[in-house]
UniProtKB/Swiss-Prot annotation:
Source organism of the structure: Clostridium botulinum (strain Alaska E43 / Type E3)
Protein's recorded name: Probable GTP-binding protein EngB
Keyword hit for GTP-binding: yes
InterPro entries: G_ENGB_dom, GTP-bd, GTP-bd_ribosome_bio_YsxC, P-loop_NTPase
Binding-site residues for Mg(2+), renumbered to this chain: S37, T59
Stated family: Belongs to the TRAFAC class TrmE-Era-EngA-EngB-Septin-like GTPase superfamily. EngB GTPase family.
Domain EngB-type G: 22-195
Cofactors (names): Mg(2+)
Function as written in the Swiss-Prot or TrEMBL entry: Necessary for normal cell division and for the maintenance of normal septation.
Length: 198
């Protein structure tokens, strides 16, 4: 599958702002600065589709991107940034929870973790949350270009053990810098929910 067209549609906070055209949705979620915007830009081959912020925790909205005029890629607010006030964290948490608990169009959640570090308590909570709501969950370990060849197995084991993944849970490494395996990752994340396949 190729992503030939990608378009920003709307930023939303409340359910009444979500798109209402009943297209399938695949949501991306992860800690602030895990490389979520870079990953979205890399997969869509658009340098500025998702804004890459130098300030962690700046994205507070749910952003909907229409892919191939067919389905939505949904960018959820980054979590876990220490310098944000508790009330702001609570607001973001509510925004994410409302979307996850009331969205029939949502078919899969892609949880991003940093391949160089052990998943945080927030990562564990987010993964468990996604599972709790019954969604198909895929783990993508970002920034894999920073790992030496010998470190991949150790990184995967640490992430799998920390999140308590089963053998059947889907796990992939990816680097937005070298873009190795972009087409394969696109297929694994989106193919079964696309209706217009090329």
């Amino acid at each position: 599958m190729r992503i030939k067209q990608s378009e920003f549609i709307i930023s939303a906070v409340k359910p009444h702002q979500y798109p209402i055209d009943n297209r399938n949705e695949v949501a991306f979620v992860g800690r602030s600065n895990v490389g979520k915007s870079s990953l979205i830009n890399s997969l869509t081959n658009r340098k500025k589709l998702a804004k890459v912020s130098g300030t962690p925790g700046k994205t507070r909205l749910i952003n909907f991107f229409l892919i191939n005029n067919d389905f939505y890629l949904v960018d959820l607010p980054g979590y876990g940034y220490a310098k944000v006030s508790k009330s702001e964290k609570d607001t973001w948490g509510k925004t994410i929870e409302t979307y996850l608990s009331h969205r029939e169009e949502l078919k899969r959640i892609v949880c991003l973790v940093d391949s160089r570090h052990k998943p945080t308590g927030d990562d564990i909570m987010m993964y468990e949350w996604a599972k709790h709501f019954g969604y198909d969950v895929v783990i993508v370990a970002t920034k894999s270009d920073k790992l030496k060849n010998a470190e991949f197995k150790k990184s995967e084991k640490l992430i799998r053990d920390t999140l308590k993944l089963t053998k059947d849970d889907k796990f992939y490494f990816y680097s937005s810098l070298n873009k190795k395996g972009t087409e394969e990752l696109i297929d694994k994340l989106f193919l079964e929910f696309a209706t217009d396949i090329d």
